[in-house]
Amino acid sequence: MANNMFDFHNEVHLRGKIFDIVEKKYYTDFFLSCGNNGREYRFKKRNGQYSRDTINVRFFKTEAKTYPKQFKIGDRVTVTAVLQNIVDRHTQRGKYLEVWGLNMMSVADDKAKDLNNVQYRGRIVSAKAINDNYIIINVKTVIKKKIKNTRENTKFPFIEKEFVSSTATGMRFPNGGAKDLVYTRYTPGTWVDMTGTVQGRKNAKTGKHTQRFVAEKVNIIGEVQKIDLRNQKI
């Protein structure tokens, strides 16, 4: 975790089974089947089995070339990654969540439980009440991670890369009052610390894989910024 409560933080920890590997020219996608202990995991399918998340972790550069040789479908692995919401470059509308992989290791302990955990800390960029029971907040982080240097004959085996992420998450308020909270609590500039899971599903209509960040806990850090949100958009 970050040392200071006002330090940005963006970290994803996954443990699950590889069920598909898709190699492209510049990246490789590893699809993981992960169970988790979040609220969404309580829901069962009609056959009585717990629903599992399918998460697409994308690796670039050296890892994109070497990992397909090291890991195969059916392997249980542990992954460290970061989150980032991407805007469709063609329409400039509709955001989708990417999970950028940093490293992946085999799971030595067969009894190790699946893991799906996100720790995310940053400033609220915008907030919007969908109705009086549900709001969406957009939170920005700027972090630096050490990654392998792929250049040959270098004195520096690792380099620092900056990840700028603006990630959206929804929050439910069964007792109502969400429309007031975007003006009084979840305001732009306010720091929040969030923990949750990555929820991934295959869209039944389009056949495409979609995923989102589901926050289980959202804590305000420091003071709530008093800003008028009437013209804010996500």
Regions found by a protein language model. Name each.
Residues A2-I234:
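Single-stranded nucleic acid-binding surfaces, predominantly the OB-fold ssDNA-binding core
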